[in-house]
Amino acid sequence: MDPSELKNIPLFAEVPDDKLLKVATFASLESAVEGKVIIREGGSANAFYAIEEGKVKVERDGEHLADLGPGDFFGEQAVLEKSERGATVTATSPVRLIRIDHWEVPRMKRAMPEVVEELQRKIRERSGSSD
C-alpha cells in the first residue's frame, strides 16, 4: 500500500518516513459496504483496522458503545492481547480500512517498537471501552 495513506491515521502520523515504508509493507487496504460486520464479538482476533474513509459503530452485547470515523482504529486490543473480540464493529457507511493482520504484529514490533508501544498506550487510554 502507499505509505502516504498511513499519514492520515493519527497512530502513524508521527512515524518517520523510513519506518512508515515498513509499516506499509505490513498493511493492506480493505473496503466494506454499509451494514457489513467487520469484526464480531467473541470472534478470533485476526487483524486490527484503521479507518481511512467512512464510519463504523461499535457494539457490545447489542449495546451501542461508540461511533468511529476517519483516523480512528479498532480491533487492536484483541490482537495485541491474543484474546477474543470484545465487541462487534459494523460499517455504517461505505468504509475504506487499513488492515494489519495479527501475524504481522511481531514483525512490526521488531521493526518499529514505538508504533506497537503507541497502540498499547491507546489501549490503556481506552481501558477496554471498545475492540
Model feature map: region roles:
Residues P3-D61, L68-P70:
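Regulatory nucleotide-sensing modules
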Residues I51, D61, K82-S83, T90-T92:
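A short, compositionally biased micro-patch
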Residues V58, E76-Q77, A87-A91, R107-M108:
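Short beta-strand His + acidic residue motifs that chelate non-heme Fe in jelly-roll/DSBH
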Residues L68-G69, Q77-A78, M108-M112:
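A short, polar/proline- and glycine-enriched secondary-structure boundary/capping micro-motif
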Residues P94-E104:
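A short hydrophobic beta-strand segment most commonly corresponding to one strand
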